[in-house]
A protein has these predicted regions:
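Bacterial N-terminal signal peptides
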Residues: 5-16
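Eukaryotic scaffold repeat domains enriched in small/polar residues
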Residues: 20-364
Length: 364
């Protein structure tokens, strides 16, 4: 069966790569960024903004690496803030929560429950709309456990444990309420739970072959219950059904300008940025995903270099792109999460610029 999956995946890989190569010159999409759309109280500050989500009322949830506590290195850095649709601050959710360690992603489900993935504590938490914890996935390492070394990367990695994570990154749901969690930096798998929180299995392992992963960084589901996984280190998006069967592999092949600015660090070397498992800074490598509501759904994808957002059809055709790396409005510094409550309305969480942006697109 595994050989069949690999063969199927390789067939789709070749076809999707060819298709995306044909879309090498999609148009730039004009857009605006709403100035000062979030209004923070005088005594609150964002740290690196790792997550952003929008509920059915238009409320915006920002997950930031603010409220830092502890030593300079290894400090806890996670804070969840809610804003109204007008950008006015409403409340902090989960102040001093036991799970807070290193903020990674926030999502809102169809019932307006708020979900948070914390990479540092290896925990996913579900809050109800009132802000109370109603479900917990995974377990934070015990403070008294001398063997707890969550930042170690043994090679080969230790075997995954059912129901537990190692540097978890994101979560999504299907129409039946099953939960899919991208687990993430180390375990390199998708973990599945039923709607009551019971373990239902997993798929994936480290590697670059079809069905394998190198940093699952974001995960979303469309209305057909197809699961899109941002396989960041391999610079691709893998699409599965709810049982873990590989359906297709999507790649974004839109070349970056030779003079494209870099958000931070040295310019990615072409050879290193395209090597298997080392595609994190390759143009089009997926850092963040979101899918618009219907009736026609679109997939938005963000990369770190050259700092673009791409608009795709669900079968991987690139319709256009917007943005570039930088520090002023309409520029981006490592987009870490996207929310797209409408086709032409996109919310952006940025790590390097410590901010969120609300974008209004004006496609021609």
């Amino acid at each position: 069966m595994k050989a069949v999956w690999l063969a199927l995946g390789m067939t789709f890989l070749l076809s999707r790569t060819a298709e995306c190569t044909a879309q090498s010159s999609p148009p730039e999409i004009p857009f605006d960024s709403v100035p000062d759309f979030l209004q923070l109280p005088a005594d609150l500050y964002f740290g690196e903004v790792s997550g952003i989500a929008v509920n059915s009322k238009g409320h915006v949830f920002v997950l930031s690496r603010g409220n830092t506590t502890g030593p300079a290195y290894g400090a806890a850095a996670a804070q969840l803030l809610e804003f109204g649709s007008d950008g006015k601050f409403l409340r902090e959710i989960g102040h001093n929560l036991y799970a807070w360690s290193y903020a990674h992603a926030v999502r809102v489900d169809r019932d307006d429950n708020i979900w948070v993935a914390d990479k540092g504590s290896d925990v996913v938490v579900r809050f109800n709309p009132q802000g109370r914890v109603t479900m917990v996935f995974g377990r934070k390492p015990e403070a008294s456990d001398e063997s707890a070394h969550p930042l170690e990367h043994p090679s080969p990695p230790k075997p995954p444990v059912d129901g537990m994570f190692r540097q978890v990154t994101d979560m999504t749901w299907d129409s039946a309420g099953n939960v899919y969690i991208s687990d993430g930096y180390i375990n390199s798998r998708v973990a599945k739970f039923d709607r009551e929180g019971n373990w239902a299995g997993s798929w994936g392992e480290p590697g670059s072959a079809p069905g394998q992963f190198s940093t699952l960084h974001s995960i979303v589901t469309d209305k057909q219950d197809r699961i899109y996984v941002a396989d960041r280190g391999n610079a691709r998006i893998q699409v599965f059904d709810t049982s873990g069967k590989l359906l297709s592999i999507l790649r974004i092949d839109v070349p970056a300008p030779r003079d494209a600015p870099v958000a931070i660090g040295n310019r990615p070397a072409e050879a290193g940025a395209t090597a298997a498992g080392n595609g994190t800074l390759r143009p089009g490598s997926p850092w963040a995903l979101c899918i618009t509501p219907g009736p026609t759904q679109y997939l938005y994808v963000a990369d770190a270099f050259p700092g673009r957002i791409y608009k795709l059809t669900l079968d991987g055709r690139v319709l256009g792109w917007l943005g570039s790396s930088g520090k002023v409005l309409k520029k981006f510094g490592w987009i870490h999460e996207l929310a797209c409550p409408a086709e032409n309305e996109v919310f952006v969480a940025e790590l390097l610029n410590w901010r969120a942006q609300k974008l209004i697109l004006h496609p021609r």
